[in-house]
Design a protein with these regions (language model features):
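Active-site helix-to-loop segments that bind/position phosphate- or nucleotide-bearing substrates
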Residues: 14-255
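Glycine/small-residue-rich interface belts in oligomeric ring/scaffold proteins
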Residues: 1-14
Length: 255
């Protein structure tokens, strides 16, 4: 059973990488370059979900926001654009979950107010944890993020990278679970005005989530088939290479 995430007291840090990571946070142009890349990756993967679900092309209003991403001059402006992209995506979420027993309505968290939001919140936590594990295998410091500001919450870089993979791992797992009727109302519990997966529900979700992580797709960049789990690790190394000016970073986009 999933209990929690344990991480080392000391990271596998490299002095040069740490200084470059801090430099890319302090210098706005360098920070914005990375932050925009995360949002572009997120946007394209959200659009992939919509396009492959049979939703009419004219109903998809995400890709035009690429100009707003490029025009954003501050992280705050970019976060507003990102929120708008998510809002457009969530308008179609009930079509994606394809289950009249579980209505999305709107995004709610802390606490999630219904079953679909419970799935999203739990799945996102799983993703944050898995990306964090990937970061610990690199020389990057997870406390320095670019889209999500470095602050007292601790780790932020894992939140940045997760934006790219949540649509194609977490959301796809949710669509399969709801579409195949693998969960029922009995797999949830109500606690302090929120709705959460119970123990049996968590087991079912984790099973589908891990299946999605192991799913292999063709990576044009690598020229071979890779699991999403390996792609997530590769994404971390790509960011490290960008910081060291080995190769410019381009986010993973599922095509």
């Amino acid at each position: 059973n999933y209990i929690g995430t344990y991480y080392p007291l000391e990271f596998n840090q490299n002095g040069e990488v740490f200084l470059k990571q801090a430099e890319h946070y302090v210098e706005l142009n360098k920070r914005m370059e990375l932050a925009r890349s995360f949002v572009v990756g997120e946007m394209m993967n959200l659009e992939y979900n919509l396009q492959t679900s049979g939703i009419k092309k004219e109903s998809i209003k995400i890709s035009p926001k690429i100009l707003q991403i490029e025009k954003s001059r501050t992280v705050e402006e970019l976060m507003i654009v990102e929120a708008g992209i998510r809002q457009e995506y969530y308008k179609e979420f009930d079509k994606l979950t394809n289950n009249p027993d579980f209505k999305f309505e709107k995004r709610t968290k802390q606490p999630p107010k219904n079953e679909v939001n419970a799935l999203i919140s739990f799945g996102n936590c799983m993703m944050y944890s898995d990306i964090l594990k990937c970061i610990f295998k690199s020389h990057l410091d997870p406390r320095i993020g670019y889209l999500h500001s470095t602050n007292q919450r601790g780790f932020t870089l894992n939140l940045d990278i997760s934006e790219i993979f949540k649509p194609i791992v977490v959301d796809q797992a949710i669509f399969h679970i709801t579409g195949q009727r693998l969960l029922t109302k009995k797999d949830f519990r109500t606690f302090e005005n929120g709705v959460y997966l119970n123990e049996e529900g968590r087991k079912k979700f984790i099973t589908e989530y891990e299946k999605q992580l192991k799913k292999t797709v063709f990576s044009r960049e690598k020229g071979r088939y890779m699991s999403y789990k390996l792609l997530m690790q590769s994404e971390v190394y790509k960011i490290e290479n960008h910081l060291l000016q080995i190769k410019p970073y381009k986010p993973y986009i599922h095509i």
